[in-house]
Amino acid sequence: MSLENSDIVFENNSIYLSNNKNEFFSINARSGTIKWAQSINSSLRPTIIENLIFTVSNEGFLFIIDDSTGNIIRITDVLKNFKEKLEIKPIGFIHAKNKIFLSLSNGSLVTINSSTGIQENVTKINNSKISRPYVLNNSMFLIKDNALAKIE
């Protein structure tokens, strides 16, 4: 298995990154020292909101982490309602309007309440892979079949 890293995120004077080797790091941006590390297997870009870090593992678990301590606040299995769970992989996610919008390799878009971790909706967008969702001018978009699609 080759190494896959998440995008690097700079926030709160820290650098955050993770990989598919069970390593999620918070690094002090000034000194380069590791503030904390967690065993999370993810190659998706984390999202930081104030002192909370949201990330989704390659196995489909949503993690919420306390930025200052590195302690895991909550873990939610976002694939628990999918029968073909082992074949599905998270593609990317965004946090907007107190919800996590997670795109999956089976063409589904999962909506999760970020406060409770409860899955609110699953929308089948396509029968194949879709991109990570994007927000522009208060509208959500993703790429499917090599075309840009607006999600209502």
Mark where each language-model region is.
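Redox- and metal-dependent alpha/beta enzyme cores, enriched for Fe-S-associated oxidoreductases
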Residues: 42, 58-67
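C-terminal hydrophobic structural anchor segments
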Residues: 92-111
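Extracytoplasmic beta-rich repeat domains
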Residues: 1-12, 30-50, 74-95, 120-137
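Short loop/turn segments that connect beta-strands within beta-propeller blades
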Residues: 28-31, 66-70, 113-117, 152
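Surface-exposed loop/turn positions within WD40 beta-propeller blades
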Residues: 21, 59, 106, 145-146
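Conserved beta-propeller blade signature
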Residues: 14-17, 53-55, 63, 99-102, ...
